[in-house]
Amino acid sequence: MDEKKLDFRRRFGRVFDRMNADTETAPHAQNQTFAPATNTDARFPECPNIYLLGFMGTGKTSVGKRLAQTLGYTFIDSDEEIEKKCSMEIKDIFAKYGEDYFRKLEREFIDGGHPASNCVISCGGGLVCRDGMPELVKSKGIAIVLFSRPDEILERIGKNDKRPLLNVENPLEKIRELLDARMPYYRRSGVMIATDKDLHKTVDHILRIYKRNTADPRQRRPKKSATAFQPPRAKK
């Protein structure tokens, strides 16, 4: 065994041993709802990206960073990438150009504004809530939808002026309203996992799903350079 494979085994051996456990006994098995089977054909690279979807406040950032650390992947936040390219905060993009323009930016990012492999992508809560977006995300990698109860979401995000859709008098009611509208898209987008358990257990559950739906992650290959992301021009 060469040095690279031996080093990978030392670092991640226990992780993949856990992933080989019987998936029927996964901690969240009772909460798991499967969308149509994830596409695993030859269009995927050997180490496809993991896309974390779901409403704001469901743990995409904390889960995503732990996943990336465990796999040795790069963590990317779609909102942060859009903010960097536009030199504007999300709330300002909404205020100046509107939600439809922001959703165009999200589509551009998913379509080619990031590396094609070796990444964990935390996606904005409404990213898949446009026609064709669930299918686009699933064509790029392994899609996981995180979900939580509305009261848990509100408790996690608190008062955050960076959440333009929740700057209303009754944010809890707004969360329920948005979840009802988005759930059909979420259900079409990937495996759904509740994030009401320990972070470590949630990450292990996702790792099992990832291994089951991809080529062996141990067969790593060099990361690809990110494609330059150019946001579309706003209509005047």
Language-model segment annotations:
Residues 140-184:
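A glycine- and Lys/Arg-enriched "phosphate-lid" helix/loop adjacent to the NTP-binding pocket
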Residues 52:
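Hydrophobic anchor at the beta1->P-loop junction of P-loop NTPases
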Residues 2-23, 41-45, 66, 70, ...:
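NTP-dependent small-molecule kinase module
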Residues 77-127, 131-138, 163:
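ATP-dependent small-molecule kinase phosphotransfer cores
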Residues 55:
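P-loop (Walker A) phosphate-binding loop of NTP-binding proteins
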